[in-house]
């Protein structure tokens, strides 16, 4: 055993260092004051620095790192198989390879926990704003759903449509506007006031669609990344959602709420439409579960072109329903829950409580 440790001393020290970081993280995550200091005074400024540095490049550094990681994984697998075949001491060689892989995995876990996982235990948007997603009454849900449907219909008159009657817009223009979309919220929520880095479109967006993702925030580069292949009608609200993560907000319900609020209040027609659309979709889904007839009545009041957009969006995502999307969303759900968010990906639906309480 001593020989095994001595022969792999560096890998063992690496393992112990990662383990120590993770142990300290789990010990201190319950100390709200310490976590708040770490998040808002250390990691958030650091991620903003990374975001500014990466903003100078016209492509997503996060996507590049994912590609490099995939290529590196294949190369390492080939090298390790070759090493195991040539080694005379198969057991020791296998142990060394397994230890190396474990070290890499724990390094990523430790870094992710420090840069992003800690945010789950810091004061969130609701803590800092005083808003709370209290359970809502049926009457409030119906009233706010109708309110969003009415404003969605109005917003629809100010956007462009293609020859098929579907929403159309220059996607790059939507991305370019994103760094000003939160300006309208700073008076009400001054703690949100910080420089934004524009979201970046992902080149391999179809892969994101297969995984059922419209966007993601990458803490290792401070970049917000968005799917450029999915229906354009919600691209603006996706941008606003991902920009909330640049502010250290981890809760998906709070990010969706902020996306709706910022989009509907800003002075860009494409963002207005996406904001009212995102809110209506969440509210409508919640209403349908409790009263399909009330949902149908509101749905029937929508102009035909909005219904066309909704059907196109549903048809687009229907083609990607399968094992890949199921597995990916399951892993994402488990990751979110591992950091104490009991709702997991279900928290995307809890935005309804915030919307109804705010607009009722």
Predicted regions and their residues:
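Active-site recognition of the HExxH zinc-binding catalytic motif
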Residues: 58, 235-256, 260-261
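Membrane-interface segments at or immediately adjacent to transmembrane helices
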Residues: 117-187
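Membrane-embedded alpha-helical segments of integral membrane proteins
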Residues: 19-82
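Post-HExxH zinc-binding segment in Zn-dependent metallohydrolases
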Residues: 139-143, 148, 250-294
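Auxiliary, metal-adjacent structural segments of Zn-dependent hydrolase domains
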Residues: 160-228, 232
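Pan-zinc metallopeptidase signature
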Residues: 305-360
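Transmembrane alpha-helices and immediately adjacent membrane-cytoplasm interface residues
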Residues: 74-78, 92-126
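Alpha-helical transmembrane segments and their helix-start/interface "positive-inside/aromatic belt" motifs
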Residues: 5-19, 96-101
């Amino acid at each position: 055993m001593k020989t095994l440790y001595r022969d792999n001393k560096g890998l063992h020290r690496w393992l112990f260092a990662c383990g120590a970081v993770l142990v300290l993280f789990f010990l201190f995550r319950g100390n709200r004051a310490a976590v708040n200091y770490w998040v808002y005074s250390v990691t958030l400024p650091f991620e903003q620095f990374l975001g500014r540095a990466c903003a100078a490049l016209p492509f997503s550094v996060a996507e590049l790192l994912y590609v490099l990681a995939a290529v590196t994984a294949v190369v390492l697998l080939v090298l390790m198989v070759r090493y195991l075949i040539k080694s005379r001491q198969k057991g020791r060689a296998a142990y060394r390879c397994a230890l190396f892989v474990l070290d890499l995995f724990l390094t990523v876990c430790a870094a992710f926990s420090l840069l992003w996982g800690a945010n789950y235990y810091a004061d969130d948007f609701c803590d800092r704003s005083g808003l709370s997603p209290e359970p809502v009454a049926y009457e409030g849900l119906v009233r706010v759903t109708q309110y969003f449907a009415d404003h969605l219909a109005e917003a629809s008159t100010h956007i462009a449509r293609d020859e098929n009657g579907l929403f159309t817009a220059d996607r790059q223009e939507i991305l370019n506007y994103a760094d000003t979309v939160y300006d309208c919220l700073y008076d009400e929520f001054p703690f949100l006031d910080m420089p934004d880095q524009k979201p970046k479109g992902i080149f391999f967006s179809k892969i994101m669609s297969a995984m059922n993702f419209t966007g993601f925030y990458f803490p290792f580069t401070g970049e917000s990344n968005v799917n450029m292949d999915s229906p354009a009608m919600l691209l603006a609200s996706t941008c606003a959602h991902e920009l909330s993560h640049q502010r250290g907000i981890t809760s998906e319900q709070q990010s969706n709420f902020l996306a709706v609020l910022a989009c509907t209040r800003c002075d860009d027609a494409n963002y207005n439409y996406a904001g009212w659309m995102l809110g209506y979709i969440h509210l409508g889904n919640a209403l349908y579960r409790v009263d399909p007839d009330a949902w149908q009545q509101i749905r029937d009041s929508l102009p035909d072109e909005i219904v066309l957009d909704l059907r196109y969006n549903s048809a687009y995502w229907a083609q990607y329903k399968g094992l890949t999307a199921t597995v990916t969303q399951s892993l994402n759900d488990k990751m979110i829950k591992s950091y104490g968010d009991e709702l997991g990906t279900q928290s995307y639906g809890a935005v309804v409580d915030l919307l109804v309480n705010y607009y009722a």
